[in-house]
A protein has these predicted regions:
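Short, glycine/acidic-rich hinge or "gate" loops at secondary-structure transitions
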Residues: 32-41
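Conserved pre-motif C helix in the palm subdomain of viral-like polymerases
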Residues: 3-32, 108-135
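Well-ordered mid-protein domain cores that form the structural environment of catalytic cofactors
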Residues: 17, 21, 25, 41-50, ...
Length: 214
């Protein structure tokens, strides 16, 4: 997978982004789903690894089926206006919001991969989706590693229905699209793939393409 990564000079841009994130981090963390991970201190791939492994081993009935979903072209597809309006519901300082929005506009459409502040904004933008997913019947466990979503539940039909509702929410509320390569399958017949690993009820293995990098 090829991505265009943008970098900013340490001074003053990098320092300003660091200061903005430091100021808004406590506010964003309060509303963040506990299994929303990636680019968050203490919540890397290992955090999701432990959650999925534990769920599969300890709750066979509640994890009969898995769903793997991705957001299509996530960073470039994020609406700057929708994002800043969502942020304005949590942060009331207009000068702060104007500064953040100026950085968003400098990305040239969507958010820039490589900007420190954009990692936090991208995670925040899906906060409402995380909350919505956990209200859906049939979704017992959910983890999200930035734009990669893994669901576990007891019923295949309910997961299919949840998948359709999630796609509709993405489009109508966030202006995003779900990748067409989504998958729903029984965990007894196929290992769950997430954060570079493949999980079964009894063991976990490193995905082949990740192993070959070493």
């Amino acid at each position: 997978k090829h991505r265009k990564i943008k970098m900013v000079p340490f001074w003053p841009d990098g320092v300003i982004q660091w200061m903005l994130v430091t100021a808004m981090k406590p506010v964003l963390m309060r509303g963040m789903h506990p299994w929303s991970c990636a680019s968050i201190p203490g919540r890397g791939g290992k955090h999701i690894y432990k959650k999925i492994r534990s769920a599969l081993r300890n709750d066979p009935k509640g994890t009969k089926y898995a769903a793997e979903l991705d957001v299509a072209q996530y960073y470039p597809s994020i609406s700057g206006k929708r994002l800043i309006w969502a942020l304005a519901r949590k942060i009331k300082d207009k000068r702060f919001l104007r500064t953040v929005y100026s950085i968003i506009e400098s990305c040239g459409g969507g958010l820039a991969i490589g900007y420190y502040i954009c990692q936090w904004l991208a995670n925040f933008y899906l906060e409402s989706l995380d909350q919505y997913i956990m209200t859906l019947p049939g979704v017992k466990y959910m983890t999200r590693y930035m734009d990669n979503i893994t669901l576990l539940g007891p019923n295949k039909k309910q997961l299919h229905k949840a998948r359709k509702l999630i796609a509709a929410f993405m489009q109508q509320r966030l202006g995003l699209s779900m990748k067409a390569n989504w998958q729903i399958y029984p965990t007894a017949k196929r290992m769950v793939s997430a954060v570079g690993y493949r999980f079964s009820r009894t063991h976990v293995i490193l995905r082949k393409r990740n192993f070959l990098r070493f």
